[in-house]
């Protein structure tokens, strides 16, 4: 899988060298895609891992993209997303407002993967007062919307950030993983998100993307949000032969097209499916 990441990274970097605005450049403006896009990495990852290659691809296609590492404890900056959902969501909210202010945009779009996808649902719901209508398109790739098991979360923390098992164990043994406690089935964060009140907030459009072959967020249908106006998408409904699982959804060009379609408000727009790497 890591060689696949490297291959995509080289290709994306080459594309960036020839076109598009810069990444994390607050002077970026795009007439074609006026909303800045904030990307939210998954559990155990950082802003320069997990969604970094998708960020390059979006940038090369004319989007202004922004990302930062959230939820990392002091002393362990290379393993993000471990803090409780509430703490991380506050960091993310502050960053969204920073991007909005510094770019002068009226709206910001969010794209998240795994825990970052869950935050794409969580932040708009629980930070409405601070955001005050700042968000527009929301794209959540494989969120554990109704929770998953700890074994799956542990594997995600290892794989998404290219971390070793011993490295993750050291971090977890030192600072723990409050996000894991929040994200397990019936965890406190999952209960808050599914408190019977709408997840989708007025003024936003949500797309949820999931793979039938996801072995880490299970059951796979747990990702979907069954509320009016939500676009719940199986990757395989568009690309039937795509075998991608949870980790590789971030590196799957078919998913990238579904993301850009969602950001452009053209969910059903056709694209050419490419082969993808299987995996959990």
Model-predicted segments: where are they?
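Active-site catalytic motif of lipid deacylating hydrolases and related acyltransferases
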Residues: 27-108, 160-170
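Solvent-exposed, acidic/flexible segments
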Residues: 47-51, 81-89, 113, 182-186, ...
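Fungal secretory targeting signals
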Residues: 1-21
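Serine-dependent carboxylesterase/thioesterase catalytic core
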Residues: 41, 65, 89-193
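Short aromatic-enriched loop/helix-cap "lid" or pocket-rim segments at secondary-structure transitions
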Residues: 52, 147-154, 218-222, 244-245
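Conserved beta-strand scaffold positions in the cores of enzyme catalytic domains, especially
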Residues: 37, 65-67, 138, 206-208, ...
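C-terminal catalytic-base region of ester-bond hydrolases, centering on the histidine
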Residues: 161, 199-280
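Extracellular/periplasmic catalytic domains that process cell-envelope and extracellular macromolecules
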Residues: 29-33, 59-60, 102-103, 111, ...
